[in-house]
């Protein structure tokens, strides 16, 4: 039985706590009207958001090289993305989540699963930096609108498209692939996982990181529930 790569569980655990903090600040600022200019009127919000989503995508790309069934992983992510879309559409607290981070992970995992034989022919030492360059070059593509309907999933939103969390395939497939190629670099010619990947310096965070998907699905309803409870008794 393959040992679990605990260092990524630890990183995920830390990132999940950061994500919960980010969404708590978002809710307080945009749903409860708190005056938080450091969050709403500065680049800090974008940096914080990127530090969460980019880590998730990079690690997911790395881990797909170790998965026995990436099609199954993609289907699990897709089901979770559907749940998020339904919940945010039916419960109108904020904009519904169309093509959010979980959708992106589902799409990227599915794409890699189907193209893995081709991707393996690309030198990882060239593939990783190339993907990072492509990520930077395509970063602004989904930040404008296009007079073409039904392509928001790819990265070309139409003028009427709205989403509370938007991570289309372009440019984020390239961050995912950067993780994929980084894994192949680290594994080397013999395809073994490096020893540092089994480090477990913070077991509590590693334990949290092993349950990233359920944590993602539940943390925002819990935060909103706590805030509603606090405000109802004030």
Predicted features and spans:
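Alpha-helical transmembrane segments and their immediate juxtamembrane cytosolic regions
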Residues: 1-234
